């Protein structure tokens, strides 16, 4: 897949829209007669923390080192402390393959995985996962021993030099041969995971993972690859992507937009992922402009997960730039520029709730602001009321998005009553409402139902891969504990 500009690029229509609502035009007078000249209700933007599918600050439970081991704390205490960090609405783990499978045909999870999944239900914070096939920051191989018995390892051209006290500079980062055994074991592992977690309440997203360091599709700074040809490399990577896409039918996949440095066809995986309605991520922000173009000009229905470390390797040093700005705050400002749905709460190779709190206490403003803007924050800024010739009432919702990102899927609006006598609605086009502008959509009320009844409420949901998730209305007033909005006239005219 050649490099291309992402602005205006044709990635297809995006996710299917079921029960599409009428979204205009809305002429006020003859011959249209929508009579939307007078506003019935208005809302103002809220500042509450929003926890819903497709967005949020995401606390890292594990990065490259597996279990977050902190002296003086049990593993449960450490993970619980990370879950309790108030700004985080999701968590993330990045285990090595050997941490979840020890033998063929069966998954056996390390304790930190099991604790994380249990606490995700306890705290209502879903989990993003990536299973690494190759990890440069450990000396042992990320692959399980039973896989290594059938899969040769190969050295690529080049070397990676740096501080010899760091593990990544102490070995040669051998790459596995992508033979039939590896592909077969990979498919088995994906199917076993999906059998347990596909569509379950614990999982938010799954990273695609295949060739290279961290499974991101590159082996920088090493040159080339260990495939017979570039064509074979692309075919193998697409095969691994297709295995994941087939297994995870109810969970969005997330592909890193890392440039195709080793010419293995990773760019084709990115393209396929977008066309299939999946999402994107980037694990460094102040880097290649190719990645920045992709993320900032992606289709509105594609979520963007930005990863950045808030501190240095020991978790307590906070680098500043030449102008004196904390590097973490600089990254956050660029995360907003990239219209991010997710951002990592990550203290690099020193994952520890104490380190997370220490950074937050020193630099609270940028994180607080991001928590109130990350992702999408939808509400009906205007609600107009009109009537059909047969007397049935219409509500026209002027939907706005006070966040920084589009809706990564399809937004469904439903007008309902608590007693179930009214339940009617439908969907906006994929990705709407965008962060700027208004998306108008009309819902016709059942015969005999009036907006003035005082019983009507508006509920929002996001549909991702055919699964619906509740979306709280992000308004400053009139919002119920379940996230719905009371439909009550508050505009006189």
Question: Can you describe what each PLM-predicted range is?
Answer:
Residues 78-164, 233-252:
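Aromatic-lined substrate-binding rim segments of carbohydrate-active enzymes
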Residues 91, 193, 206, 244, ...:
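Conserved, mostly hydrophobic/aromatic
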Residues 207-308:
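Substrate-binding cleft/loops of secretory-pathway carbohydrate-active enzymes
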């Amino acid at each position: 897949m050649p490099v291309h500009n992402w602005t205006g690029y044709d990635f297809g229509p995006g996710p299917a829209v079921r029960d599409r609502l009428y979204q205009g035009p809305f002429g006020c007078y003859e011959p249209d007669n929508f009579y939307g000249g007078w506003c019935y209700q208005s809302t103002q933007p809220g500042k509450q923390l929003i926890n819903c599918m497709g967005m949020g600050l995401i606390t890292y439970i594990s990065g490259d080192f597996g279990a977050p081991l902190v002296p003086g704390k049990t593993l449960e205490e450490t993970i619980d402390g990370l879950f309790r960090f108030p700004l985080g609405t999701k968590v993330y783990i990045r285990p090595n393959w050997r941490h979840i499978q020890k033998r063929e045909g069966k998954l056996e999870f390390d304790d930190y995985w099991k604790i994380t999944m249990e606490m995700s239900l306890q705290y209502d914070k879903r989990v993003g996962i990536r299973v690494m096939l190759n990890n440069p920051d450990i000396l042992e191989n990320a692959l399980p021993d039973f896989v290594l018995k059938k899969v040769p390892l190969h050295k690529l051209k080049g070397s990676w030099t740096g501080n010899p006290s760091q593990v990544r500079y102490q070995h040669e980062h051998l790459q596995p041969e992508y033979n039939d055994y590896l592909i077969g074991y990979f498919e088995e592992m994906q199917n076993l995971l999906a059998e347990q977690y596909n569509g379950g309440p614990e999982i938010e997203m799954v990273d695609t993972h295949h060739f290279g360091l961290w499974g991101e599709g590159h082996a920088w700074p090493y040159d080339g690859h260990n495939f017979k040809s570039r064509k074979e490399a692309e075919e193998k990577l697409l095969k691994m992507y297709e295995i994941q896409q087939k297994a995870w039918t109810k969970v969005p996949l997330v592909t890193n937009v890392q440039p195709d440095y080793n010419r293995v066809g990773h760019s084709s995986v990115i393209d396929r992922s977008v066309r299939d309605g999946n999402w994107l991520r980037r694990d460094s922000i102040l880097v290649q402009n190719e990645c920045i173009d992709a993320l900032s000009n992606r289709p509105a229905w594609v979520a963007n997960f930005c990863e950045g470390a808030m501190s240095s390797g020991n978790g307590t040093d906070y680098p500043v730039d030449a102008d004196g700005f904390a590097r973490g705050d600089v990254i956050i400002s660029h995360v907003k520029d990239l219209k991010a749905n997710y951002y990592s709460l990550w203290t690099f190779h020193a994952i520890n709730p104490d380190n997370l709190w220490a950074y937050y206490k020193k630099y609270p403003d940028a994180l607080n602001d991001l928590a109130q803007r990350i992702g999408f924050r939808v509400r009906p800024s205007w609600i107009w009321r009109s009537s059909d010739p047969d007397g049935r009432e219409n509500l026209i919702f002027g939907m706005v998005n006070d966040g920084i990102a589009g809706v990564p899927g399809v937004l469904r609006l439903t007008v309902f009553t608590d007693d179930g006598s009214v339940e009617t609605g439908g969907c906006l086009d994929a990705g709407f409402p965008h962060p700027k502008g208004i998306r108008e959509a009309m819902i016709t009320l059942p015969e005999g139902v009036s907006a003035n009844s005082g019983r009507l409420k508006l509920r929002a949901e996001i549909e991702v891969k055919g699964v619906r998730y509740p979306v709280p209305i992000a308004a400053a007033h009139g919002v119920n504990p379940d996230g719905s909005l009371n439909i009550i006239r508050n505009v006189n005219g």
